[in-house]
Amino acid sequence: MFVARSIAADHKDLIHDVSFDFHGRRMATCSSDQSVKVWDKSENGNWHCTASWKTHSGSVWRVTWAHPEFGQVLASCSFDRTAAVWEEIVGESNDKLRGQSHWVKRTTLVDSRTSVTDVKFAPKHMGLMLATCSADGVVRIYEAPDVMNLSQWSLQHEISCKLSCSCISWNPSSSRAHSPMIAVGSDDSSPNIMGKVQIYEYNENTRKYAKAETLMSVSDPVHDIAFAPNLGRSFHILAVATKDVRIFTMKPLRKELSSSGGVTKFEIHTVAQFDNHNSQVWRVSWNITGTVLASSGDDGTVRLWKANYMDNWKCIGVLKGDGNPVGNSYQGFFGSSVGSAGQSLQNSVNGTPSSGRKHS
């Protein structure tokens, strides 16, 4: 059964993003009040704010967790044109703060000349890497060569997307058959510009990222984008949040059918398109197995989508902030840990501005 818990976040302005850690027991929120808050889940299921601090000198658009293999590490990005990496430090035995934790800024990434609109850590098999995207259309990929020293980050790649960028998503596949891949969404409002989702793939020969595909059917501003976790599939699934919810499959073509430059080409199909929110869709998030998608929109609901055995995607649940499910087909899906995604998305619904993220 779905239970909605209202959390008095105590942010002084709009909450733009909510992010859960790998285990789903820690949560980070960020806001236009320039702060980030960290929340821990107690044994009785209640969330308690354990840290709150001013992170930037402008609205904080996104916050995200690194894999716990690298410690308790957060990244944030802001209208102030920077991204920052934070690490939780627990007081040592000779410290007055023994056993107490606090968050320390390890680095500030200052390469962008415009608002940094999204930040995402790469899948852990790639090492400690971080991607940012900016309103000026540049995606930057950084690497921490020494995971024990988070103050040193080197800029590895700059990708010019030619369109203002609003969101990014790494392909989580760890298969050696799949090169590192990142999807970029644009919130450019011009209806004349098609292809507001671009896919970039790492080329081992050139050691650079090159554009593999453009989803020409996406012509409306994109607010969020998410590759599904890949548990042995030979193809990729990508969800896009725009004026509706869209789900694409990307099936790699055989190398001899791909371009001679070595970039993989894909057979792309729109397998689902839903306008049930009847409004802008702000967030899309997959469960851990990549079988259930949660979306949130300006209608104040979180909607859950799942494919049946015929690969037909259907809505299996509608969740409202007051905890009341709408419809009757939602039972049985919580075994796939959609609850955290739903809660994350509901918080995003409550705080995401409809004015976009380029201007404060």
From Swiss-Prot:
Keyword Cell cycle: yes
Keywords assigned: Cell cycle, Cell division, Centromere, Chromosome, Chromosome partition, Kinetochore, Lysosome, Membrane, Mitosis, mRNA transport, Nuclear pore complex, Nucleus, Protein transport, Repeat, Translocation, Transport, WD repeat
Domain of life: Eukaryota
Keyword Cell division: yes
Cellular component GO terms, alphabetical: cytosol; GATOR2 complex; kinetochore; lysosomal membrane; nuclear pore outer ring; Seh1-associated complex
A molecular-function term among this protein's GO annotations: structural molecule activity
InterPro entries: G-protein_beta_WD-40_rep, Sec13/Seh1_fam, WD40/YVTN_repeat-like_dom_sf, WD40_repeat_dom_sf, WD40_rpt
UniProt subcellular location: Chromosome, Centromere, Kinetochore; Nucleus, Nuclear pore complex; Lysosome membrane
Activity modulation: The GATOR2 complex is negatively regulated by the upstream amino acid sensors CASTOR1 and SESN2, which sequester the GATOR2 complex in absence of amino acids. In the presence of abundant amino acids, GATOR2 is released from CASTOR1 and SESN2 and activated.
Annotated GO biological process: attachment of mitotic spindle microtubules to kinetochore; cell division; cellular response to amino acid starvation; cellular response to nutrient levels; mitotic metaphase chromosome alignment; mRNA transport; nuclear pore organization; positive regulation of TORC1 signaling
SMART domains xrefs: WD40
Xref: PANTHER family: NUCLEAR PORE COMPLEX PROTEIN SEC13 / SEH1 FAMILY MEMBER (PTHR11024), NUCLEOPORIN SEH1 (PTHR11024:SF3)
Task of the protein: Component of the Nup107-160 subcomplex of the nuclear pore complex (NPC). The Nup107-160 subcomplex is required for the assembly of a functional NPC. The Nup107-160 subcomplex is also required for normal kinetochore microtubule attachment, mitotic progression and chromosome segregation. This subunit plays a role in recruitment of the Nup107-160 subcomplex to the kinetochore.
Protein name: Nucleoporin SEH1-A
Organism whose genome encodes this protein: Xenopus laevis (African clawed frog)
Gene name linked to the record: seh1l-a
